[in-house]
A protein has these predicted regions:
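Hydrophobic helix-coil surface modules that form long, contiguous segments used
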Residues: 1-157
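Catalytic Zn2+-binding segment of zinc metalloproteases
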Residues: 160-176
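Glycine-rich, histidine-containing beta strand-loop boundary motifs that form or position
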Residues: 115, 167, 180-181
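Short, intrinsically disordered, charge-balanced linker/junction segments flanking boundaries
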Residues: 15, 158, 177-181
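Active-site metal-coordination segments of metallo-dependent hydrolases
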Residues: 93-94, 173-181
Length: 181
């Protein structure tokens, strides 16, 4: 069993929520960080119509999510981040993912995948279908500058946007960089 029944219940609640819901709380992530896993957990990933893939795993991850409705479909906008990403990530990441999906879908075509995930990375931005790794971290005391905040928001918008170009459209980002960056 990968998620506890309580976490599964939160996930189901997040599907219907227009605000992020904690799936793995900061307290649960802290407990996970303190102890080693007993046994194994198996996650099975399957994706259609993707040209690349990426995934992230850490017992330190806090996980929040919210549903984004496109007609009769719900796409899950989600974020995974360690405690070092807060308060910035909890406040902004998933909301920015959801907003980006709505905006790109309005101006191009509906987002076809079931999830869009933003993963905290210390200082990079990199995209794969349905998942992107984004920088932006507050200082160790939890404070952050406007530059850090808007830099994080900008890189999330940019990397989630790469789901459309080049991932879904399947443009060649090396040949047509003007479409990519």
């Amino acid at each position: 069993k990968v998620l506890s029944s309580e976490q599964r219940s939160r996930y189901d609640k997040a599907k219907k929520s227009d605000e992020p819901v904690m799936i793995v709380t900061p307290e649960e992530a802290l407990e996970n960080e303190k102890k080693k896993a007993k046994g194994t957990k198996t996650w099975v990933f399957q994706a259609e119509n993707v040209r690349d893939f990426g995934f992230a795993s850490s017992r330190k991850f806090i996980w929040d999510a919210q549903g984004v409705t496109f007609g009769n479909r719900t796409v899950m906008a989600m974020s995974y981040y360690p405690k070092e990403g807060n308060p910035l990530w909890e406040k902004y990441s998933t909301r920015v993912v959801a907003h980006t999906l709505k905006t790109y879908s309005h101006y191009t075509f509906p987002y076809p995948y079931p999830v869009a995930i933003s993963v905290h990375a210390n200082s990079i931005g990199m995209e794969y279908p349905m998942i992107c790794f984004n920088g932006g971290r507050p200082e160790s005391d939890g404070t952050y500058t406007a530059r850090t905040k808007y830099g994080m928001i900008s890189v999330i918008i940019h990397e989630v946007g790469h789901n459309y170009f080049p991932m879904i459209v399947n443009s060649d980002e090396r040949q047509w960089t003007w479409m990519d960056e």
